[in-house]
Every structure is written in structure tokens, then in C-alpha cells.
Amino acid sequence: MRPIPYDISLSITSFLSLILICSANPIDNGLVDSELIHECVTHKAVEVILLLDASGSIGDDTFKKQLSFAMHLASRLNISEDGSHMALIQYAETPKLEFSLGQFNHPTQLEWAIQRIEYQSGATNTGQALRLTLEKGLQGARPGIPKVAIVITDGQSQDDVSEPSQLLRDADVMVYAIGVTNLVNVHQLHQMTGNPVRVFTVESFEQLDRALADSLTWSMCKTEFRPGTPEIICGPDRIGVKASTKQPFEGNVFVMDHYHDEECRAGPEKFPDSRSIGLTVPFSACNVHRYRSLNPKGIFVEVSIVFMFHSLFMTKTDQTVKVQCFYMEADKHVTVPLSVSMITTVFREQIYQMPQCAYTLRKGAPDGPIVRFATLGESVYHRWECIEVEGADKDTFGMLVHSCYVDNGYGDRVDILDSNGCGLDAVLLSTPDYDTSLRLATKPYHVFKYADRPVLQFQCQITLCLKYDGGCEGITPPQNCKKLPGEDGHHHHHHPEKRRKLVRRLADGVGTIDVFTDSVTVLEQEPACQQPLPYPLINTNLWIMGIITLTNIFVFILTVWFTFRKRRCKPA
């Protein structure tokens, strides 16, 4: 993997580290030799913070093997005043910074500092060690020099490692993790690194040797101690992307359509390392898009981020990255008291496949072509539909469309259906009409747009219900919707008692998902096209042109004839 030369073209879907399939990279040192590594590190500098496990399960002899590995690693790096610097933290119940970056810049001095470290012992709090790395371990780090943290552990941390690891990555620190023995929690290693490529595992501390030091050094150096490929960030409350370039970055990274929002943009002044760039934004800002999924059950979060390489202008080298994270909903375990009975009870469980739901805008009719361009005032149909996966003959689910809004892509939103599924403004959208299956709803509307904003996108929530044993009664169709000014036709008016049941029955729904239309570009008027001439007029024009052409030919022939005759009649 190599740093990208102004090319970050990709579309990524990432899963939160909590649901990553835990697997570790075996050590592959077959093509790595000392000469290759020496050539790689000679002209490259890096700030390395090494975190050694000093918990009670380690012991003094095993801890010394970690110190030997630290010396192997230091000998591979270009340790010098202008080259690489190293800091070291040993951690147990309480982490301790043994020496800081830049404190020992000569290989002999650094080796002496490592040898004098004494084993600490205690509980395993890797999270605290990562926090100490952020608070004190980075002191003395030079601007423009990439930063790497390497964590060695033989088990499971007793505190949280996810949040401090994310904070380190936000500070442009690339984290590597080495798990020793089969008892190590590989899942936590993935949480620390954020990328399985930077996870190494060995079976014993005897394998913390020169070969591993070579493999680790090469893995870091071959991408110049920066991310080799763009990496996305799926935080608990934010989303983003990180990448590296071959040349110093002088442009801006921003959320599409939000260049002028400071929270949604990062420039060179925000990148300590001008070749390691990226942007993270909170879920609540920059029009970050979120929608729920029932299968698998969880939430998708997505945003489009633009890498603009010129400081002022968009150019052909700029790239847009669509970043998507999926946050899976954890299973809920409910404990209930059990009563002992001599009577055997038989339970039968029925599993239903969830329907596939879609929201589209149709031209001219509810089943017309999907609209992506429309004219202001044009009649277009909203269409919500859930299709039974098990076959059209099934009649398992019903649906309620509710909580709809229209968005112009700049964070400006206007509600058009309320939480009960009723229309709010007849000019924008009235209460949808449902067919008898309760899995299809449609409603016509006349195209509108925001002032100076030609693009619209609609989003709604669909709550599903099981029709079995009256499970959709009181949920759908929407109940007791008020007639809106300027609205005609059928309206859903029901007994007030059913209205009171709606909130209670919505909670009984199978699940709620988010659906949204394609973006629609609204034109003020249709482009003027030149009308073809009527057929009789075309025919007349052809006759006229023919007569003129024949006349010209006749005149030309007469002229030639008279000229020729005049010459013959001249006296010799």
C-alpha cells in the first residue's frame, strides 16, 4: 500500500469496530530483510510511542523480553536528532511515562534508557495508557512528522480502549497493536487500531524478536508511517475519513455543499502533518444523513466529503468520497421470573421475513417513471411501497408512512407529514391514500422548490405492523387527520377513540425504517426547443427552392450560349 498521489476516489462502507469480525494478521516476514528496511527508514523520520504491558500476568522475565523487543525496534529506526524519536510507556493499573519524545536521540543513550526500566506489575488498564499517550506521550512531537503508537498486550484490558484510541486517531496518531498469546482479546486490538491491517498476533513472548521488529518496521515504513489507503472513521457520535498524500496538502477537505460552514471544513492549518489529512463531523451537523435498517437491524450514517487540492478553486484532480458507517443494534436480553409447573407447555414460533420498502417520486401517474428532473408546478406522485419478500400472495404486513420532511441538501428542512402520518400543508403534501393491502400509499403534488435551491430530497419513516390478529388496526391508515385549507377529496376521519389508541399501537409496530427519494432537480421552466415546421409549409418551401434553382440554371445556360455565339460572329 502506498500513499495516494492526489487520488482518493472510492466509496466506502464501514462497520463500527464493535461489530467487526475479529481476525488478526499473521506475521509474514518472507520478503523483508535488513537492507530493505534500512533503505526505507534512512531518510524518513517518525515519532514512535511504545506501550509495554506490565500487568501481573507478565512477570519480570517476560517484561524483559518486551524491553529487548523495544531495543530491536529502536535499532531498526533512524534514531537521531533529525531522524526518528521514541518515547516509552509501561502500563499496568497506572501507566507511567518512562521517557518522552526527543529525550534520548542517540541509539546508545536510548538503549541505556530502555535497559534501566523496572517492571511495575498490577491490573491491566490499557485505556489509561492510551489516554496518557495523548496527554503526555505526544509532548515533544515535531510538527509535520508522522506519529505512531505501538501497543503490546497479552490479555484483555479492564477499562475501555475504544474512546481513547479514537481520540489518538483524531490526533493523527496511527495505532498498531501486538497481541501476545491466545488469551489476547483480538476485538480490543481492532478497537485500538481501527484497521485490521495494523493488528499483529504472536503465540508467545519469545516471538517478540528481530523478525517481528523487521515486519512491524516495514509495515509502518512502506507507507511512510501514514495510512496507506484512505480510512474511514466511525465514531460513537461522528463520522469522517482520513488519508495521506505524496505532496504537502494545500487545499481543503469539506462536506459536500457545506464549504462555508467552519465546522464542516478543514484546511492546512488544521493538519499538523501536511501529508496526513482528513475530516470528522458530528452526526448532528453538516447535514449528515442517518436512516434506520431492519435487516440487519441498526442505523446507517453517511456523508459525502470533498478533497479539494487547490486552495481556492475546484479542479479535475479533486475527489469526492462517500463515507458510510453502519451501527448495528445490540441484542437486548430480558430476564423474567420463571414459574415452576408440572404442565408441559408447547410454544410455536413463526419467523417472518421483513418486506422491502421504497419511496419514489413518479411522473404523471402513481406507477409512472421515476422523477429526477421536474418543472416547477408539474404534477408528480409520491409513492411509498413495501413488497413482501416471501411472495406477492402473502399478506403479512401493513405500513404507516409518517414523519416526512423535504430537504434542500443544505440542512434546511420542512416537515410535510406529522408523526401520525397526516399532511401538514396541502400545498406541499396532503395525507397519503392507502390501497387495501396497506402496503402501498400514493399522493399527487405539484412540484415546488426552495428559493435559490434547485435540488430537493424527501425522507419519511415507515412503521410496519403485522396484520395477524388485527395487529394493524389503529396504526394504519392514519387516523383523524384534519382537512387542510385548499384540500379536496377523501380524508381519513375516524372515531376519536381510535385516535387515542394510535400512540399506544405505534409502539406495537414491528419496526420503523427510514426511506428517502432520489434527489430531484427542479427547473423553473422546460427548456425552449425549436418547433418543427408544419409539413405543408415544408413542402411549399421545397417547391420555391426548386424553381429558384432551375431559374438560375436556365440563366446560366443562356449566358454561356450568348457568349459563345458572340465570339463566333466576330469578324476575323
UniProtKB/Swiss-Prot annotation:
<dbReference type="Pfam" id="PF25057">
    <property type="entry name" value="CUT_N"/>
</dbReference>
<keyword id="KW-0472">Membrane</keyword>
<dbReference type="Pfam" id="PF25301">
    <property type="entry name" value="CUT_C"/>
</dbReference>
<dbReference type="InterPro" id="IPR036465">
    <property type="entry name" value="vWFA_dom_sf"/>
</dbReference>
<dbReference type="InterPro" id="IPR002035">
    <property type="entry name" value="VWF_A"/>
</dbReference>
<dbReference type="InterPro" id="IPR051962">
    <property type="entry name" value="Cuticlin"/>
</dbReference>
<feature type="glycosylation site" description="N-linked (GlcNAc...) asparagine">
    <location>
        <position position="78"/>
    </location>
</feature>
<feature type="topological domain" description="Extracellular">
    <location>
        <begin position="25"/>
        <end position="541"/>
    </location>
</feature>
<dbReference type="GO" id="GO:0060111">
    <property type="term" value="C:alae of collagen and cuticulin-based cuticle extracellular matrix"/>
</dbReference>
<dbReference type="InterPro" id="IPR056953">
    <property type="entry name" value="CUT_N"/>
</dbReference>
<dbReference type="Pfam" id="PF00092">
    <property type="entry name" value="VWA"/>
</dbReference>
<keyword id="KW-1003">Cell membrane</keyword>
<feature type="signal peptide">
    <location>
        <begin position="1"/>
        <end position="24"/>
    </location>
</feature>
<comment type="function">
    <text>Plays a role in alae formation in dauer larvae probably by regulating cuticle assembly.</text>
</comment>
<keyword id="KW-0325">Glycoprotein</keyword>
<keyword id="KW-1133">Transmembrane helix</keyword>
<dbReference type="InterPro" id="IPR001507">
    <property type="entry name" value="ZP_dom"/>
</dbReference>
<protein>
    <recommendedName>
        <fullName>Cuticlin-6</fullName>
    </recommendedName>
</protein>
<dbReference type="GO" id="GO:0005886">
    <property type="term" value="C:plasma membrane"/>
</dbReference>
<keyword id="KW-0193">Cuticle</keyword>
<keyword id="KW-0812">Transmembrane</keyword>
<feature type="topological domain" description="Cytoplasmic">
    <location>
        <begin position="563"/>
        <end position="572"/>
    </location>
</feature>
<feature type="domain" description="ZP">
    <location>
        <begin position="233"/>
        <end position="479"/>
    </location>
</feature>
<feature type="transmembrane region" description="Helical">
    <location>
        <begin position="542"/>
        <end position="562"/>
    </location>
</feature>
<keyword id="KW-0732">Signal</keyword>
<dbReference type="GO" id="GO:0042302">
    <property type="term" value="F:structural constituent of cuticle"/>
</dbReference>
<feature type="domain" description="VWFA">
    <location>
        <begin position="47"/>
        <end position="216"/>
    </location>
</feature>
